[in-house]
């Protein structure tokens, strides 16, 4: 069986540029996911609210070339999961859709829908409540900031944009 891994490309918007370079430098291969940072202060009361992360991302699945002895690899776009971090319980928040399944063609800003279990919760800029996880819990070996991401037919269409 050949080793498969993932590469995460991050297009950071102005409001999140300070967090992600530091997170990339300090990440550990022992982590199951890549932590995301809130890019705005958000107050959550009675209705669900979207927490923005200030980034657009692309996850690539990387596989060694089949039947080859070379170091060449095949890279393909991959779906990924947006999951709450275990520490989210301290915030009084609950992810409204339990797990976010992000299509490989999505090119909009990442956001997480949350409910307040207390009826009055807040999120501050820089809070880490969510993470990107590879679909098979695979290793996100490389994370890098990029200046652009390739366009897709879907583009930035967000929640519910591909059907009811």
Where are these regions (language model features)?
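DUTPase catalytic domain/fold
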Residues: 1-164
